[in-house]
Amino acid sequence: MQYTEGQLGRVFVVRIDDGEDMLVTLRQFIQDKGVQAGSIVFIGALKEGRMVTGPEEPVYPPVPHFVMFEGGWEVFGVGTIVPDKDGPHIHYHASVGRAGTALTGCLRETAVTYLVIEAVIYEITGLSARREFDEKTQLELTVLGNPGEGEKDGEAGPEEKEEHPALPEEKKEEKSELPGGLADIIRDLTRRPPT
């Protein structure tokens, strides 16, 4: 396991209209706004797209199983934004459904909007994260923490430590109500002063 910690930065709400490729539109928007790391959630519909629905066989390196879909498909999904050598890289996963058929996987290459898609982009600042090529999987994977950080004298870097600093008692109680980082994000959003 690896981890890194950051802070919630800007939040953008984006409407993508009929005929626009969601992948192209969001990539351009993220580059234009200078978002280097964050997450995306989106809902709406697609008229066509291409997705990887798992590997052909569960072997290393994986051979992706591509599926094309066309027509009006409802969609909801999430994405992560992590920098690579060329700037912000977006990794999308989504579920699409139409008339009792559903697909779930990694959106790739094209995702053309039908009617509208609404997306919310959460910028995360202060992260130590990057995408790097992984020899075993032959994929660009997210690596968390700074290269070489904490590796001298056999110590694990901060991203590999098992113990976490104690939280004040009030935060411990709040954190137990919701899983993982979701509680922290919701808490941060609800505590922000009005603008």
Across the structure, where does each feature detected by a protein language model lie?
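Intrinsically disordered, low-complexity terminal tails and inter-domain linkers enriched
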Residues: 151-176
